[in-house]
Structures are given as C-alpha cells and as structure tokens.
Design a protein with these regions (language model features):
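Active-site-adjacent structural elements that line small-molecule/cofactor binding pockets in enzymes
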Residues: 1-254
Length: 254
C-alpha cells in the first residue's frame, strides 16, 4: 500500500508524518511513502498556495524528508530550517516499520535524483519535465541512453548504499499497448511525440525506452526482464492491470 506522489508543498510535514504513521500501523506495516516537490501549478492555484520556483520546492521537499524521519524516530523532535520550524514535537504515533516506511522519490533531473539517492529506498526513474506554466515531458529523456545517465547520477550520489536501492519505472511515454505489430504502434507514438514536442525519436528508441511498453505478451515479458538485467530496474508501476495480467503470469517464477 502506498502513495505515488504526495506533494509536500501542500501539506505540513509534521502533520503528514502523523497521518502516514497511522496508515502504517493500521496496514500492519505495509506502507510505502511516495513524495514529490509538486509540478502542477493549477493544483496550487486552486487552493491558494503559491507555486514557487522549482529550486525552492526541492528545498521544501528536502526539509520535509528530514522532518518526516525525525517525527518517525523515538522521542521529541526539533528542527529549524528555511521553510519549517519544529519545536519539541513528539510525532506520535510511530510507524510500525522501523526506522520508517520505505520512502519513494522520483524524478528526471539531477537535483531530484541526487536527493533520492541520498534519502530514499525506492527511486522512480521519470522523464525530465520542461518547466513552465504547463510543464511538459522532455521527450529526449524517455530514451534508454537518458536512463543510463540518470542511473549514473544515482550511483554517484548513493555511494555504498546504491546496492540497497530499488529502481522503479512506469509508462510515461504513452499507454501500455498489447499488440502483435509493435513497430506500427511505435511509429504512431513517434509521430505523436514529434507533433507535440518537435522531438524526433526513432521507432527503435521508442521500443527501447524504459517508459514505453508496446508489444505482444512475450515481447513485454522479455522487456520487463531486460530492464531488470540491463538497468537493475525491479519495480514497475503499470497502467493496465487486466492487459498485463498475462505478462505477470509469463514472468512468474523468474
């Protein structure tokens, strides 16, 4: 059980810690905590919370992680940062998982992935977002080559703990499509990406992307296995459980 992305800019981390600890206790220690710095300006505008520059939001996220871990620890916790001040907060209840539930951080840029490498247990490999009033995916960051670069950043920042990290990916280059003609679907996908972003990706780059899942049941089973072997990715968020159920059966026991 877990959250994919909780926008910490919309929630005070000390209050969030109590909510998350309660969920972990009630679930018998099954919670995973997905956190993020926020990216969707309209989400902020709708409730009157300023949408700050990305660097400020990442600093808020960094402080929030420190506060969550402090609140989950034993005894009162105090913290004085640029964005939050905590004074003698007990942080009850405490989570069932000690020292805390696994933290899931993801991103496509070096700053967020470096933070994730230092603080998280699960790291989501995401495409980079081009900032603006309506952020959009940088299509170039969907490729396998871009993923290799992201993993290098993570390895450098994680140091000795790299082997303890779980790497995750999910379909952000379009929906999962089960088909016996993957190249035709990949050409359509490449055409849409070119029309929307101006970026030219080849059919091979589309099919090779860790963020695109197109092919037959056997194709997709091979791809999941290849992502584990090639990149060390062992965690996947999928967008169509029914379509991929045969893939899971194909991979059972591997």
């Amino acid at each position: 059980m877990g959250t994919f992305v909780l926008n910490v800019c919309l929630r005070h981390p000390a209050v969030l810690a109590q909510d998350l600890a309660t969920l972990d206790v009630l679930s018998g220690g099954r919670l995973e905590i997905g956190l993020g710095a926020g990216w969707n300006k309209p989400e902020h505008d709708a409730i009157g919370i300023p949408f700050e520059p990305v660097g400020v939001r990442i600093k808020r996220l960094t402080e929030a992680i420190t506060i969550l871990k402090g609140c989950f620890a034993e005894g009162p916790f105090s913290f004085s940062g640029e964005h939050y001040i905590i004074t003698g907060h007990d942080g009850a209840p405490k989570p069932a998982q000690r020292p805390h539930p696994p933290i899931f951080l993801g991103g496509g840029g070096k700053r967020l992935l470096t933070l994730a490498a230092r603080e998280a247990q699960i790291i989501g490999l995401a495409p980079r977002l081009v900032q603006g009033d309506a952020p959009r995916v940088d299509a170039r960051s969907l490729t396998a080559a871009a993923t290799e670069e992201k993993i290098r950043w993570i390895r450098e920042a994680a140091g000795d703990r790299f082997g303890e990290l779980e790497l995750n990916t999910y379909p952000t280059g379009g929906p999962t499509v089960v088909t016996d003609d993957p190249r035709a679907e990949a050409r359509r996908r490449a055409d849409r990406i070119r029309e929307q972003t101006g970026v030219e990706l080849t059919v091979e780059e589309i099919l090779d992307s860790p963020h695109v899942f197109i092919g037959s049941i056997k194709d997709l089973a091979r791809k999941f296995a290849d992502l584990r072997e090639r990149f060390g990715i062992s965690s996947f968020l999928i967008d169509d459980l029914d379509a991929l159920a045969p893939v899971v059966e194909e991979l059972a026991g591997q």
